[in-house]
Regions:
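Membrane-embedded transmembrane alpha-helical bundles that form the catalytic cores
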Residues: 1-221
Length: 222
């Protein structure tokens, strides 16, 4: 979206700042969908009093803001529960868990990835019952086996894309590129390589669009 906006002369701020590198849900929501979080903070959370109120009122503010965030995505129970789930997680972190997560970064990363994954399932579920069936199956309690021939086939087929996505979800490529640019004699070579890489990515995206089936925009259903 930032690149597309730049094509038309608009300078959009960064909206996602490596959220999967977060070590807490609190940090995750400072990095994920920054513009949405800022809007709810400025126009709902702060007018309600924010955190400068009594504890009971502050808890109420958190729940109301996150229930509204879920409702913003869609008028269905799974979206409301999705928002309330994050409200509970944020309150638990602010109450006592956050200092522990800051000291144990690996545990914090696993904590984030686990609950974000659960949140995505809840977000995309057609109903609460559908969400529960998916969760049961994910943990081996349903009829779907955790490992099948089909799942191994897809894992093998898309291993390269998955690895690229994992690396791209971290700031490592940007940091490496910045260090290489500082070295003498490499800037011109990197500029040419960047153009070639962007052209290759454009062609790859077009190839996927041509080969893939029609997939309507997610928010059209809300």
């Amino acid at each position: 979206a930032v690149g597309l906006g730049a094509v038309f002369g608009f300078d959009f701020p960064e909206n996602f700042r490596y959220p999967y590198c977060s070590a807490s849900i609190t940090e995750f929501w400072r990095r994920w969908h920054i513009s949405l979080g800022a809007w709810f903070r400025d126009y709902l959370y702060i007018p309600l009093g924010g955190s400068h109120v009594k504890p009971v009122r502050w808890i109420f503010n958190i729940f109301l803001v996150w229930m509204a965030t879920g409702f913003w995505h869609g008028a269905a129970w799974n979206f409301i529960l999705w928002g309330l789930m994050y409200a509970v997680l944020l309150l638990i972190e602010k109450a006592w868990l956050l200092p522990y997560l800051k000291k144990h970064k690996i545990v914090g990363h696993l904590h984030v990835l686990f609950f974000v994954l659960i949140g995505f399932v809840l977000f995309d579920a057609s109903s609460v019952a559908d969400f529960w069936d998916c969760i049961v199956s994910m943990f081996g309690g349903g009829q779907i086996k955790p490992v099948t021939t089909e799942s191994l086939y897809y894992l093998k087929s898309y291993a390269g894309i998955i690895l690229t996505a994992v690396i791209g979800a971290t700031p490592l490529p940007v940091r490496l590129y910045g260090r290489l640019q500082k070295k003498k004699g490499l800037k011109q070579t990197l500029d040419i390589a960047e153009i070639l890489l962007l052209v290759m990515l454009l062609l790859l995206c077009v190839a996927f669009l041509v080969d893939g089936s029609f997939n309507p925009f997610l928010y059209f259903r809300f």
